[in-house]
């Protein structure tokens, strides 16, 4: 499922609410949460909520005169789609060139290298 960058900001608010057991959220609550992060008008946020509804990324339930929004798309599923798309677009679906790119541009710190070594050892040991 394709979620735009702006839509992902709205999704983050809904995922955070879900993780902290505050979901579902009304549109006003989403607007209030985003007022601290973005300089968006209420109409923009409601448009983004409607787009996410049409895509099936969120669901809405009626609560009196308002709607409450809950994520359907999990953050983990979105992250997997996004990372696989990035990997495919930029590195022909291969992880090694991605790591090499960051290594060449000095974006890997000692902690990153240690974590990568540990992951490789786990793969060698047959662990997922």
What residues fall within each predicted segment?
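Short, locally clustered residues in the helix-turn-helix/winged-helix DNA-binding domain
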Residues: 12-19, 35
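Glycine-centered, phosphate/nucleic-acid-interacting loop/turn motifs that mediate DNA/RNA or nucleotide
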Residues: 56
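Short beta-strand "wing" residues that participate in macromolecule-binding interfaces
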Residues: 60
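Pre-recognition alpha-helix immediately N-terminal to the DNA-recognition helix
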Residues: 5-13, 29, 97
């Amino acid at each position: 499922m394709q979620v735009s960058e702006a839509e992902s900001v709205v999704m983050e608010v809904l995922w955070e609410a879900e993780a902290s057991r505050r979901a579902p959220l009304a549109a006003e609550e989403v607007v209030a949460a985003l007022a601290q992060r973005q300089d968006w008008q209420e109409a923009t946020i409601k448009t983004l909520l409607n787009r996410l509804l049409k895509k099936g990324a969120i669901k809405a339930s009626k609560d009196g005169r308002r709607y409450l929004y809950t994520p359907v798309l999990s953050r983990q599923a979105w992250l997997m789609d996004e990372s696989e798309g990035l990997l495919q677009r930029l590195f022909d679906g291969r992880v090694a060139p991605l790591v090499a790119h960051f290594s060449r541009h000095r974006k890997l710190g000692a902690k990153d290298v240690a974590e990568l070594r540990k992951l490789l050892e786990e793969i060698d040991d047959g662990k997922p």
